[in-house]
Amino acid sequence: MPIVSGLYRFPVKGLSPQSMSSVTVAAGQPFPMDRIFALARPDTSINSKNPIWAKKSKFVMLMADQQLAEVQTEVDLDTLEMTIKKNNELLLKLDLANQSGQMALESFIQNLIPSLNQNPNLVQSLDGHFMDKPGNLISLINLETIRMIEKKWDAKINPLRFRANIYIDNAEPWSEFNWVGKDISVGGAVFYVDSRNSRCGATNVNPENGKRDLNIPGSLRRTFGHKDLGVYLVAKSNACVSIGDYVNIPDTPTIVIAQSSFQEPSLNSFICQGCYFIYDEKVGCAFSGIKPGTKFGEIQKSWLCPDCGANKLSFEKFHLN
């Protein structure tokens, strides 16, 4: 029977996970204290007094800034004291509750990330989160799915690459995709399985050393014809979830979760180097109001990736290999 094997929150978007033995979730609310802080890029217009959710490109994050994984951070969520270490050596201790501590973190991150020419701006969500998706979603990873692709690719994959809140074990590989649109219970909590999780370039970063040593989205596309791994949940009840809790899953028929080979887009396609969104000139982009047949060069320069919000310059011509 599937069982909860790990619970994690990420107090600061892009920085280290913090493991938990149990957590109390609330109906319709995000995972508690997860991504409540974020570092807005200096060229963005995020309102620091009342920051609202924005696409990931507005923030310092692993998709663009792999150096974040070179350090290990921990936030005491009762006191907001934060420590930053590298190779177990304490580099900095600060207090996120006061301005001097916030400025110290901003300065540290600016020095850590070569692409930042100014300090980022630390922001705190007042009643939400800074996850990649706007809804109050909770992410789940099935460890058996990761083991399956490890064998297929002959690669060792640290599950923390996927930065999920809930990790489960003993479920059939890919069976989590069958649960979309249905309810599951985890311990005493009930969750609606909202959607599959489309992966971005953040998963290419090794959380142990900050190196980009795998191409997770590209490999998923080549192997299975999609770049999805894991699912998003919505809490439907107020309850405690603990490591060791059993996961009751719906009785669903087996579905085809992967194509045997990747169906390559048309020759006139362009891919976002961050999130791996593909713009196919033949298809256009309905989300952005771009009609089928519109050439990439004809799209206005101010156009942003509909998935991650990166600018048009982040795209390059798509090639399968």
Predicted segments, located by residue:
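Metal-cofactor-dependent catalytic cores
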Residues: 1-271, 282-285, 321
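A generic structural signal for ordered secondary structure
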Residues: 181, 289, 306-314
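Short cysteine-rich clusters marking metal-coordination/redox-active sites
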Residues: 272-275, 305-308
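Detector for the N-terminal beta1/A-loop initiation region of ABC nucleotide-binding domains
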Residues: 278
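Short, non-ligating residues that shape and space the ligands of small metal-coordination modules
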Residues: 281-282, 313-317
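Short linker/helix segments within small regulatory modules
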Residues: 287-302
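Compact Cys/His-rich metal-coordination microdomains
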Residues: 302-303, 316
